[in-house]
Amino acid sequence: MNDIQIPIIFTDAAAKKVKSLIEGEDNPNLRLRVYITGGGCSGFQYGFTFDDQINEGDLTIENQNVGLVVDPMSLQYLIGGTVDYTEGLDGSRFVVQNPNASSTCGCGSSFSI
């Protein structure tokens, strides 16, 4: 039995969407990279990109044979969080539910600690 605690949850909905987006690409090594940058109305901002590189120190989480990659600097702000994919009246997007954020902006794409 594996008791290793995964610091971020990569939901089935997010993994399914990543899988559908990369199926049309000619690169089986693509993964979703989530990262934190300075900016946004609350001080920090979430970013998402597709990446086929895994750098030293990156955390990789697999779900449904697709990967989520987080760099060490961003990981410290995302521990305990969830990367999800939502569809609703305000559109469809990848979202981060972050228990470390003391406040978030209305659109949910930036936060403060």
From Swiss-Prot:
Required for insertion of 4Fe-4S clusters for at least IspG. This is Iron-sulfur cluster insertion protein ErpA. Belongs to the HesB/IscA family. PROSITE patterns: HESB. Its cofactor is iron-sulfur cluster. One of its GO terms (molecular function) is 2 iron, 2 sulfur cluster binding. Homodimer. GO terms for biological process: iron-sulfur cluster assembly. Iron-sulfur cluster binds at C41, C105, C107. InterPro entries: FeS_biogenesis, FeS_cluster_insertion, FeS_cluster_insertion_CS, FeS_cluster_insertion_RrpA, HesB-like_dom_sf. GO terms for cellular component: cytosol. Binds 1 iron-sulfur cluster per subunit. The keyword Oxidoreductase does not apply.
